[in-house]
Every structure is written in C-alpha cells, then in structure tokens.
Amino acid sequence: MGNHKAALTKQVFTFASELYAYGVREVVISPGSRSTPLALAFEAHPNIKTWIHPDERSAAFFAVGLIKGSERPVAILCTSGTAAANYTPAIAESQISRIPLIVLTSDRPHELRSVGAPQAINQVNMFNNYVSYEFDMPIADDSKETINAIYYQMQIASQYLYGPHKGPIHFNLPFRDPLTPDLNATELLTSEMKILPHYQKSIDASALRHILNKKKGLIIVGDMQHQEVDQILTYSTIYDLPILADPLSHLRKFDHPNVICTYDLLFRSGLDLNVDFVIRVGKPVISKKLNQWLKKTDAFQILVQNNDKIDVFPIAPDISYEISANDFFRSLMEDTTINRVSWLEKWQRLEKKGRKEIKCYLEQATDESAFVGELIKKTSEKDALFISNSMPIRDVDNLLLNKNIDVYANRGANGIDGIVSTALGMAVHKRITLLIGDLSFYHDMNGLLMSKLNNIQMNIVLLNNDGGGIFSYLPQKESATDYFERLFGTPTGLDFEYTAKLYQFDFKRFNSVSEFKNATLLSETSTIYELITNREDNFKQHQILYQKLSEMIHGTL
C-alpha cells in the first residue's frame, strides 16, 4: 500500500506541476470522492488558486469566464460518473469560441468499468465531438513510463492551449483506492515554466544560440512528406552538422558528405556518443535503435514539424516549432559558425567504414538483405519504391545509401494492411515497384483487383520467408520457443503463383540471390517477382553483420 501511495503522489503532483508549467494558474473543483488525489494536489500547489463550486455545469462556465478574463487556460475537475456529463454545455461553448478549457474527469479504475460499479459510466471519449484533444491517462503505478506519459500528453495537448489551434482538451484520469496522496511530499510540486515556441512562424535565433553554439550536434530527419529539404543541407554544410537521414526523408537522394545513412546499424551495433543537442525534423524516424537512443540521451532536443499536431515520439522535446524545415533553418543562417570539423569527421569516418562493411556483407550474403540490396541497384531514377512495413522497410533503412530514387511507405500507423492497394494508387501517377513480405502481401491480395480492372502497371518484389520474419528479432524467439512458430512465425505455405494468375500478373520465382542478380525488372508489364528466403538463415546472417559493425565501431572510436 505504501508503494501505491508513493506512486499516486508522484503521478498527481507531477500532473499538477505540468499544468502549472503550461500556464494554468486556476482550477475550478466540483467536490467528490474520486477526484480526491488531484483536488489535494491542486490545493497543495503553492501557485495554483482553487475555486470550489458544487454544480459542475455552473463550475465549467465559471471557468470559461476565468479564461476570458485572464487570457490563460483554466482547468476544471470533477468526480466520476454523471458529474462529468454536466460539463458538456461549457465544453461545446469553448469549442466554438476556441477557449482553452482543460477538462479533468476523475474515473474509476479499469477493473470497475462496465461491471455495474457505482458512479461508473463510460467517460472515455465522452466529449469527442467538442474537444480538440483527449486522452485516457494510465493509472498510477511505480513505472517511469506512466510519469513520462504525463509529460508526453501535456506536450501534445499544449498546442491547443495557445495560438491558432486553441480549444478545449479532455484528460480522463482513473484512480484506485486509497485516494489520498502524501501531502508531506510537496517538494514534488514544482513551479517551473515550459517554453511554448511551437506556434511561432518565425524563429528568434538568439533564443537558441546558447544551445546551437555547442559543438556536438545532430540533425535527425524523418519522413518529410514532400516538404522541401534544401535548407537542411545548406545549414548542415555551413555549420558542419551530421544529418541522420531516414529513407523517407528524401535526403538520401543527395550525394552529400554530411548525410549519414548507416546510423541504424551503427546504433544497433553499440554506438553511443555524447551529444549536446539534436534537431529533430519531420515525422519520427523508422529506426527503433535511434528512437531508443533519443529516449535516453541527455541531449537538448528541438523538434521541427510543419503540422498542426506535433508528434513527440519517442520523447517530448525540450522545444518544438510548428514551421517548415526550410523556414526554420533559413532563419538560423546568420549565426556565427562553430568549429565542428572533428565532430563531423568522426561521423563521416563511421559512415565510410559502415558502408564498407555493408558492401562486403552484401557481396557474400544470401539472405533477404542481399535481395533488397540487389533491388535497390536495379531500381532506376525514373522509378520509385513503395516499401511495406515490418522487415522490408528496415532493410531499406539499412541498405539505401545515397541513390537518387524516391521511397514511400505507410508509416502513420505502421500496419501491414492495405499496402498493395496504397502502392497501386500511387502507381496511377508514378512508376512504382512494391517491396513487400509474404504476410503483408497475403493481407491485401484483394487489392490486386484494381490492377486487373484498370490496367494499372506495377512490379511487386515479394520476399517470401513463409511467415513473420521480424518476430525472429524479438524476445519472443528465445522466451517462447515451444509456441513461437505457431503464434509468431505463422507459416502459411501459400503458392503465390496462383495469385498472379488470378489477377493476371506475370510471375517469376527466384530461389537464390545469384538468380535475381541476372533478372531484369520490366517496367512495361505488371510482374510479381517472388524471392524465396529462409527466416532462420536471415536472422543469423544479420547477426554476423551486427558483430562486424560492432568491431568496427570499437576500433574507430
């Protein structure tokens, strides 16, 4: 029980402190039992004024008045059950009037939902027609991830508290008995302010100078979704900053010495450098290892996204800007240059040696990477690659090294559904080659009908390892050996030659990399090129590459 109280105290005191950090100075509380933890946290906070009103409908409108008068966001808090429903009129008013009302509804813990417990209704998404953002918070526990969720969600929600996107937001907060936090732990209640510059359309370079004047910086660029990227290259050239470029950034098309492509394999093989600051541009990167590093590094992080909703994954940045990458970097060009030559050269040496190891590996490899490497070689500048999720996009991330081709993928939800159909839609306007695994292909075989009915030409390179190859890289492979093949390997034994006949595609099967090397990808027809691979062999050969890169890293640093 002591651990529960400590976890509850940490959670609600952190939540109250984060609200203060984003500008909340007043909270209107409608008394109730389930809201006890937060009510006490707000009451104990030295710089938050609490108002008490027993009628939730009136309390919410009173808060609307506070916002109008103070021009600051104000929070309202109620207990669980029908009490929350009384907030609806004021929330609707706030939506139409673009008023930053923060709605906090206390809730029963998950085990008391939908079982007939008293004062328990479905409060999740209950205001979804009227709020700009909503989230069902995790229940208090001892994990760091639960506290991080508060930081992440407040970072995301804060964009609706100020600027052009103002409007009401809703946090539903479940609490488990006992409900009283430790009121002696007031040192957890902080009054620090968060900087909110991500609504600026221009940048005050002087505000960032103390960060950008440090030597060890990185630019990390994810999916840019057709945005212009030339100023990223220009800034990197002037200020000697390495660019870790995701394959969807479209920066790998440029033969630029500062563009680093092998970073995923480098981090996967043990690279861990001290970095002063990181400028993250665009959507989150594909690389799991780079995202894990971003989550743990102490580097100051700047996020640049030209979206009205920022994507903070894998961790909330220190500062974020809603602005195009070109405008952001252009605004920083007048700063004095910093001597970072040795820092940049260290990354360039790693990149050069990493590429050499990859080249040597591909010359003798017989796994899926070797097939993907050959596909990249065969793809002309007139063609674009559409890459399926799971293993194909990861292999392309590792093997696409400065070739002038466009790469596309569905990296919103990262699912394997609808890949064939999305690629065919693109093939109406571009020459597309689809790289896809057998399970993803099976999942959307019906999508091929559009090609048959409308004569849409597209080549499909089908990596067939008869199952889910990516699961071989996850802990389940070792911890659930007796069940792995049935639950995760999921072999289907399908013969896709019949699929090709059904939808009038040409079909060619390759049982080895050497066979595929001699093949020609025809652009004037629709062909399925099936590449037969072995999951276990693929995993083992990848481990050899990781080991060689690890040895190279330790010999270079």
Curated annotation (Swiss-Prot):
Q: What class of enzyme is it?
A: transferase
Q: In which pathway does it act?
A: Quinol/quinone metabolism; 1,4-dihydroxy-2-naphthoate biosynthesis; 1,4-dihydroxy-2-naphthoate from chorismate: step 2/7; Quinol/quinone metabolism; menaquinone biosynthesis
List, separated by semicolons, the cofactors it needs: Mg(2+); Mn(2+); thiamine diphosphate
Q: Which GO terms describe its molecular function?
A: 2-succinyl-5-enolpyruvyl-6-hydroxy-3-cyclohexene-1-carboxylic-acid synthase activity; magnesium ion binding; manganese ion binding; thiamine pyrophosphate binding
GO process terms (BP): menaquinone biosynthetic process
> Per the annotation, how and in what number is the cofactor bound?
Binds 1 thiamine pyrophosphate per subunit.
Name the HAMAP family for this protein.
MenD
Protein's recorded name: 2-succinyl-5-enolpyruvyl-6-hydroxy-3-cyclohexene-1-carboxylate synthase
| The gene coding this protein | menD
